[in-house]
Regions:
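Hydrophobic alpha-helical transmembrane segments
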Residues: 41-45, 67-72, 110-111, 140-144, ...
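Hydrophobic alpha-helical transmembrane segments of multi-pass integral membrane proteins
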Residues: 50, 110-124
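Alpha-helical transmembrane segments of multipass membrane proteins
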Residues: 52-57, 121-122, 197-201
């Protein structure tokens, strides 16, 4: 009788231990996802406010159609992509939200890229306000299509490469990705962002703002040079991958 009671007691104790571990794990996952969701929402709405301020304050009006068009083309796909990543790949989303570069070269590239956007947005808005230049409607439409396609390709690159982050680093257990767009060029994400960045001032309807974005490909070249040095030193198989895939961002050119 005592043996049966002891066995039953052990089963109950083990059940409670397992239940507590299950609740703890679920609670930890819930807290982690809640924190990620809050971080995502804060950065998303902060981005809307910042870009809106950079466009509409210098424009001196909210009646800036190209400004609204750009914000829609930028933030609607961003919202959709964010929802998909949050549901399907929260770890990748967390990495994409992290923007603390460790390399000095990369820190400089990030700062100059931010400066390009800041100046480009303000000059585009001032161009609209004072009528410095006029971009034909068909150019705005083509640029809008290019921006959307670039965003779609950007999402595809993220789907192919689970190690993709905003910072240049070699992650734990990282492997070389050589499928999809990575079979064509070694840095498809950067290739896509060049098209995306250069389409922005045209969507905003400003030739003068385009001049601000022209240096962006040069910054990408600097970033790639530094990144490949880091990957060759820390990522097994990357040297062989470089020999296999010759082009960095544009086939038959570079």
């Amino acid at each position: 009788m005592c043996g049966c009671f002891s066995a039953f007691h052990d089963i109950i104790i083990q059940y409670w231990v397992n239940l507590n571990e299950y609740i703890y794990d679920k609670g930890r996952v819930f807290m982690k996802k809640s924190k990620l969701l809050l971080n995502t929402l804060v950065k998303f709405f902060a981005g809307i406010i910042l870009v809106g301020a950079l466009l509409f304050l210098p424009a001196g009006t909210f009646h800036y159609f190209n400004g609204w068009l750009f914000m829609a083309l930028l933030f609607v796909p961003m919202m959709i992509l964010g929802i998909v990543l949050f549901l399907k790949a929260p770890d990748l989303l967390a990495k994409r939200l992290s923007s603390k570069e460790k390399e000095k070269t990369q820190q400089g590239v990030v700062k100059f890229s931010a400066l390009i956007c800041l100046l480009g947005f303000v000059i585009a808005a001032l161009d609209f306000r004072f009528g410095w230049s006029k971009v034909p409607l068909w150019v705005v439409i083509v640029a809008s299509v290019i921006l959307l396609i670039s965003y779609g390709l950007y999402a595809e690159v993220m789907r192919e490469n689970a190690y993709l982050s905003r910072t240049v680093e070699v992650q734990e257990n990282q492997k070389v990705v050589d499928t999809g767009m990575y079979k064509i060029v070694r840095h498809p994400m950067y290739a896509v962002t060049i098209w995306l960045f250069l389409s922005i001032p045209l969507v905003l309807g400003s030739w003068w703002a385009l001049l601000c974005f022209v240096p962006y490909p040069i910054l990408i070249a600097v970033r790639i040079k530094n990144e490949e040095k880091i990957l060759e030193e820390g990522l097994p198989g990357y040297t062989e991958y470089k020999q296999k895939v010759r082009w960095k961002i544009l086939p038959f050119v570079w």
